[in-house]
Amino acid sequence: MISRHLQNNLMSVDPVSSQAMELSDVTLIEGVGNEVTVVAGVVVLILALVLAWLSTYVADSGSNPLLGTIVSAGDTSVLHLGHVDHLVAGQGTPEPTELPHPSEGNDEKAEEAGEGGGDPTGEPGAGGGVEPSLEHLLDIQGLPKRQAGPGNSSLEAPVRSEDSTCLPSSPSLISVRLKFFNDTEELAVARPEDTVGALKSKYFPGQESQMKLIYQGRLLQDPARTLRSLNITDNCVIHCHRSPPGSAVAGPSSSLAPSSTTEPPNLGVSVGSLMVPVFVVLLGVVWYFRINYRQFFTAPATVSLVGVTVFFSFLVFGMYGR
């Protein structure tokens, strides 16, 4: 009796247990247990975190030997450059260090000459071997001092040397810098008595009517004016402009002429001004076909035509209603 009762109880509980066993037997991946899948997922997650941390890791400059060598090389280059600048600066001002030596040598020679105890034939020979080099050194060092005045700076000396090479030796000639609008210059040599027309014909032959000379904001229109009367002195800058042949100014009388004679009429047609009339004509033609041949126009086409017309009307009123 007891065995039968237990068997009946097992039979009654069997459906639930069978469903639980079926659910427990279901795996995420067929052929692989759920435990293996969970462990593999955890390992992959840990690897992803480690890789993400390594990708954001930045090594210190002190721990990287390559970066340290680069920085050290850069420091040494800076030090070398500073040493070179110091040497150049030392070579640029040799007067305070070298000038006392010749003076001491001259004092010693004066003392030896005053004593007169040495060999008269040997001492001049020895002094003659050293004295020319010292005098040559003194001449080289004293030359810049004689050339540079007390009020001149170190930057004015190269400019004056360049001017001395460009300027002629004759005092009656002056040099004028002709500067164009494209930053090119030309050095012109003329006399103060030369006129503007002579300057144009000398340096711009055949282009006198096209060239415009501007000095201190003034247009040099009178070709009979001399350079002296215009206060054009040595090393002055005159700006030159080459105008097109059609709009060239011949002289002061041509500036008084009406603008229609100097400027050609604008015969070109502006395409932008014709856009609105052409678009109006196209809209009118489309509306004509819409009214007379309405069977060829569908409802979306009619709505689009109305929208384009309204938009164009607002655009035209916005442009010409100001």
UniProtKB/Swiss-Prot annotation:
Primary location: membrane
Compositional bias segments (type: Gly residues): 115-130
Region (Disordered): 88-168
Cross-referenced PANTHER family: PROTEIN C7ORF21 (PTHR14557), TRANSMEMBRANE AND UBIQUITIN-LIKE DOMAIN-CONTAINING PROTEIN 2 (PTHR14557:SF4)
GO annotation terms (biological process): ERAD pathway
Top-level taxon: Eukaryota
Keywords annotated in UniProt: Membrane, Transmembrane, Transmembrane helix
Name assigned to this protein: Transmembrane and ubiquitin-like domain-containing protein 2
Gene source species: Bos taurus (Bovine)
InterPro entries: TMUB1/2, Ubiquitin-like_dom, Ubiquitin-like_domsf
Gene Ontology cellular-component annotations: membrane
TM annotation in the entry: 38-58, 267-287, 296-316
